[in-house]
Design a protein with these regions (language model features):
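Short alpha-helical segment immediately N-terminal to, or the first helix within
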Residues: 26, 301, 374, 504-505
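Accessory DNA-binding and partner-docking regions appended to nucleic-acid-acting proteins
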Residues: 1-3, 337-338, 347-356, 363-365, ...
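Flexible coil/turn residues that form the inter-helical turn or adjacent wing/linker of helix-turn-helix
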Residues: 164, 378, 509
Length: 551
C-alpha cells in the first residue's frame, strides 16, 4: 500500500491538503522536517501516513494527556494500532503496553516528554526499531514561546542515546521566527525540509467588541447559537465562575473549567464538552491545548489575552473542521492592568537567570502592547495577525487591505446598532442579568430575530447551510446517531465522523459500500464499523419523508 492507499484506507480521504504531501514525501525520503501549519490544516496526517509505511515505531512526543487520548482514540477508530504512555496509566498498564509494542502491535506510540527521561522507557527504546520521533506542539521547546515546557529540552539527549538516529519531525501551529530558530537548533534538525503553509485561517471570522455589558452580550449570543459548540475564555477563575453562574441561571447548557476545580471535576466537565453533552465551556486558558474537538463554532474571549500568540492559538480552536466559525474578543481597558499584573508577578523560571528573566518580562510587555494594538486597530484584523507572524497577505489592488471577513473590514450596521445596547453595564437590564423566565423568553425571541444580521458577517454561515431544509433534518438525525454511537464506544462524537463528513453524507445520500466510501472522511475501517448503521438511518429518514408526502 502506498501513501495514497494509506490516506484512503485508514482516513477516508482521496487527496492530501496543501503542504501535507511535501512533508510526507520528505519523511519517506529519510529527511527531518519542520511543519508550521495552522490549526485544522492536518498536521497529524503528515506524520501518521509515513509512520504506517515505515518499518519501525514512530514515537510522538505530546505535551498533554487529553491530546494523546484523543489522537490514539481517533487512530484506533480508523483501524490503526496506536497507544499512549503517560502518567494516567498504572505501572502494570505501561509494562503491558511496552510489551505489546516490542511484539510489533503498535506502529505509533504517543508519549509525554517526561517519560523519555525514565530508565524503563529508555530501555524499551533501545531494544526496538524507532523509525521516527515526532515532536508535536514543537513551540513548547522554546523559552521565548508562550507554552515553554522544560521537559522538551531533553528530547535531543534521548535521541542521542538510541542505537540509530531516527528521522525527527516537528510540528506547530504558531511560531515566530525566534521560536522557529529555537526548534531547529534545540532539536538539532539535520538539513530539514521546512514548510510554512501560512498562518491564515480563512474560515474564521475575527471580531473585536468595545463593550461594557459583556454578560448581556454573551447571554444573547448563546441564546442565538443554541445548537453550536463554543468556548468562552476568561482571564481569571473568578470571571469563569461569574459567567458560568449567569449563563447557568438563565437556563443555558454550559460547563466550566479552571485549575481551582478538582481533577475529577475538570475531567468530568471536559468530557461533557467533548462528548457534546454540554455544548459550551467557560474556561481559563488552562483549557484547550489538548482539545482536538473539530466542531467548535465560536470562541469568545471575555477578557483580552496576554499576547497574539495566545489569542491566535485559543481562537484557533474554532473551526478545526474547516467550516465557518467566529472568534470574538470583548475588549475593556481593565484587561491591560490584569495582564500587566500577571506578567510582573509571575513565578520565576528556575531554568533562567536574572538577566534572562528581565529580558523575558520586557518581551512579554511588548507582546501585550501588540495585543492591545490589535484590539484598537481600525485596519484589517486578519492582516494584523498575519503580519505579526511575519506573513504579508496578497493585496494585488494595493491600498487598504480588506479580508471581507472581520469586524473592521465588514461594517454591519445592524450589528453596530445591536452593540450599542451593550455599551453600558445594566443599560438594558438591571444587574445582575435577569433570571426571570419571561425576560429570557423575550431575549430568545429578539435574539433569534437579530441573529441573521447582528451576529454574522456575510461569510459567517453554519456548515449545514449548504443543505436544504430536508438535508438539515437528516444532518441532525445523523448527528444524534453519531452521539449515541460515541457514548456506546467511549470516544468523542467527532472521532466517529466529523460534521463535514456528515454533511457530505447528506449531500451524497449513500446506499451502498461504494457510495459510502466516496464520502470524505469514510475509510474502510470506519465503513466496516459504522457504514451500515448510518446508511440504515439515511434510508429510514428518506422512507419516512416519502410516507409523509404520500399522506
Amino acid at each position: 500500500m502506498d501513501k495514497y492507499g494509506i490516506l484512503k484506507h485508514y482516513f477516508g480521504y482521496d487527496s492530501f491538503r496543501p503542504g501535507q504531501e511535501k512533508l510526507v514525501d520528505a519523511i519517506l525520503a529519510g529527511q527531518d522536517v519542520l511543519g508550521i501549519m495552522p490549526t485544522g490544516a492536518g498536521k497529524s496526517l503528515c506524520y501518521q501516513v509515513p509512520a504506517l509505511l515505515m518499518s519501525g515505531i514512530t514515537l510522538v512526543v505530546s505535551p498533554l494527556i487529553s491530546l494523546m487520548k484523543d489522537q490514539v482514540g481517533a487512530l484506533n477508530q480508523a483501524g490503526v494500532h496506536a497507544a499512549y504512555i503517560n502518567s494516567s496509566l498504572t505501572d502494570n498498564q505501561i509494562t503491558k503496553a511496552l510489551a505489546f509494542a516490542k511484539q510489533g502491535r503498535y506502529k505509533i506510540i504517543y508519549v509525554a516528554p517526561e517519560r523519555l527521561e525514565t530508565w524503563g522507557f529508555l530501555d524499551f527504546a533501545t531494544h526496538v526499531e524507532i523509525s521516527m520521533i515526532t515532536v508535536d506542539e514543537a513551540h513548547c521547546i522554546s523559552q521565548w514561546g508562550q507554552d515553554f515546557r522544560p521537559s522538551y529540552l531533553n528530547i535531543l539527549s534521548f535521541v542521542k542515546k538510541l542505537a540509530r538516529r531516527p528521522i525527527i519531525s516537528a510540528f506547530t501551529a504558531t511560531a515566530t521566527s525566534k521560536v522557529r530558530d529555537d526548534i531547529l537548533q534545540i532539536l538539532s534538525l539535520e538539513r530539514p525540509v521546512i514548510l510554512t503553509t501560512g498562518f491564515d485561517r480563512s474560515n474564521l471570522t475575527f471580531k473585536v467588541k468595545h463593550i461594557k455589558d459583556k454578560d448581556s452580550y454573551i447571554l444573547d449570543y448563546l441564546v442565538s447559537h443554541r445548537q453550536d459548540s463554543g468556548i468562552i475564555y476568561c482571564a481569571t477563575r473568578k470571571n469563569v465562575e461569574k459567567v458560568y453562574d449567569m449563563l447557568n441561571a438563565n437556563g443555558l447548557s454550559v460547563t466550566k473549567y479552571h485549575a481551582g476545580l478538582s481533577a475529577e471535576e475538570r475531567k468530568e466537565n471536559q468530557d461533557s464538552f467533548i462528548y457534546d453533552i454540554k455544548p459550551v465551556v467557560i474556561a481559563t486558558n488552562a483549557f484547550g491545548m489538548g482539545i482536538d474537538k473539530s466542531n467548535v463554532r465560536f470562541v469568545i474571549h471575555y477578557n483580552m489575552p496576554q499576547c497574539i500568540e495566545n489569542y491566535y492559538q485559543e481562537a484557533g480552536r474554532a473551526g478545526r473542521d474547516g467550516e465557518d466559525s467566529e472568534c470574538v474578543l470583548l475588549y475593556s481597558p481593565q484587561d491591560i492592568m490584569i495582564n500587566k499584573f500577571f506578567i510582573e508577578h509571575r513565578e520565576p523560571n528556575p531554568d533562567m537567570d536574572a538577566e534572562e528573566q528581565a529580558r523575558l518580562m520586557i518581551l512579554d510587555k511588548r507582546r501585550l502592547n501588540a495585543m492591545v494594538d490589535y484590539c484598537k486597530t481600525t485596519d484589517c484584523l486578519r492582516e494584523y495577525i498575519l503580519k505579526y507572524f511575519g506573513e504579508r497577505p496578497d493585496n494585488p489592488g494595493g491600498g487598504r487591505y480588506n479580508c471581507h471577513n472581520c469586524s473592521n473590514c465588514v461594517v454591519d450596521e445592524a450589528e453596530q446598532e445591536a452593540d450599542e445596547a451593550y455599551m453600558y453595564p445594566g443599560n438594558r437590564f438591571s444587574a445582575p442579568v435577569s433570571r426571570n423566565a419571561a425576560m429570557v423568553a423575550d431575549r430568545m425571541k429578539r435574539s433569534a430575530a437579530a441573529a441573521k444580521s447582528a451576529y454574522a458577517t456575510p461569510k459567517s454561515k453554519k456548515p449545514e447551510d449548504a443543505l436544504n431544509d430536508r438535508g438539515v433534518m437528516l444532518f441532525n438525525r445523523l448527528r444524534e446517531l453519531r452521539k449515541q454511537i460515541a457514548v456506546s464506544v467511549g470516544v468523542p462524537p467527532y472521532v466517529i465522523f466529523s460534521d463535514r463528513t456528515l454533511i457530505d453524507m447528506c449531500l451524497k445520500v449513500p446506499f451502498n459500500e461504494e457510495e459510502m466510501l466516496s464520502v470524505s472522511g469514510v475509510g474502510e475501517n470506519k465503513y466496516e464499523r459504522y457504514g451500515k448503521v448510518f446508511m440504515d438511518e439515511i434510508y429510514d429518514f428518506l422512507d419516512g419523508m416519502k410516507q409523509n408526502l404520500a399522506r
